[in-house]
Amino acid sequence: MSASGEISTPQEYIGHHLNNLQLDMRTFELVNHHTASSFWVLNIDSMFFSLLLGAIFLLIFGRVAKGATSGVPGKMQTFVELVVGFVDGSVRDMFHGKSKLIAPLALTIFVWVFLMNLMDLLPIDLLPYLGEHVLGLPALRVVPSADVNITLSMALGVFILILYYSVMMKGIGGFVKELTLQPFNHPIFIPVNLILEGVSLLSKPVSLGLRLFGNMYAGELIFILIAGLLPWWSQWILNVPWAIFHILIITLQAFIFMVLTIVYLAMASEEH
């Protein structure tokens, strides 16, 4: 089941599947994982698959929206309407502001994260094998949400929106006042309040990104361990139950990321 003819031990197999296809931003050459690499690298595979899945989402939902009819809907239109209705209901329950951005943002996050997570159900050797033997790639990882750079980048985008809504709804003065005069409303406690509120604010994107990354990385690692440590004829014994259970994790993590985004933006939009 090895994706490379040079891989001879389970340890090498597991390590190989945890390597990203990286581009050295200083030399613009692919990184050789057998040698030390610099900090300035770009995970090409994570970027490619995340953008590809985002484009697939836009294409499918865009075509369904343009071809939507008021009559009896087809299967795809019914499915899209079900997803949109579910997300819209979640937004209405949790966000009570007037912004028209939240519902489309929540829909994009839910479907996009779900599609990225769904890549974890592909056979672990399929795309890496094709990438190596057809395209000559040294490594390939196909689950963008198992890359901490992707999840923290998405969380950073949410953090920027939190700051934007906080300033827009409360003004700069109100936002600064919230950071310096809560929870203790006295000037002497400004340093303490600033530390407490600052940590609380910064912990939101960090926990948001690391939660998704941790769950998807662990799920991917279990699939790799099953493939790397068991004979090919017995892998299905563990693969099938774990894949069925992992479907729940995939959906749940996409839902949690969406819900926390809505909640954080709702909190930022509250006027005190």
Curated annotation (Swiss-Prot):
Protein family: Belongs to the ATPase A chain family.
GO CC terms, sorted: plasma membrane; proton-transporting ATP synthase complex
Domain of life per record: Bacteria
Name of the protein in question: ATP synthase subunit a
Topology with respect to the bilayer: Multi-pass membrane protein
Keyword Kinase: no
CDD domains attached to this UniProt entry: ATP-synt_Fo_a_6
InterPro entries in the cross-refs: ATP_syn_F0_a_bact/chloroplast (IPR045082), ATP_synth_F0_asu (IPR000568), ATP_synth_F0_asu_AS (IPR023011), F0_ATP_A_sf (IPR035908)
Transmembrane segments: 41-61, 101-121, 143-165, 221-241, 243-263
Subcellular location field: Cell inner membrane
Gene Ontology terms describing biological process: proton motive force-driven plasma membrane ATP synthesis
Species this chain originates from: Sodalis glossinidius (strain morsitans)
Record's keyword terms, sorted: ATP synthesis, Cell inner membrane, Cell membrane, CF(0), Hydrogen ion transport, Ion transport, Membrane, Transmembrane, Transmembrane helix, Transport
Purpose of the protein: Key component of the proton channel; it plays a direct role in the translocation of protons across the membrane.
Quaternary organization: F-type ATPases have 2 components, CF(1) - the catalytic core - and CF(0) - the membrane proton channel. CF(1) has five subunits: alpha(3), beta(3), gamma(1), delta(1), epsilon(1). CF(0) has three main subunits: a(1), b(2) and c(9-12). The alpha and beta chains form an alternating ring which encloses part of the gamma chain. CF(1) is attached to CF(0) by a central stalk formed by the gamma and epsilon chains, while a peripheral stalk is formed by the delta and b chains.
GO molecular function: proton-transporting ATP synthase activity, rotational mechanism
Gene3D superfamilies for the chain: ATP synthase, F0 complex, subunit A (1.20.120.220)
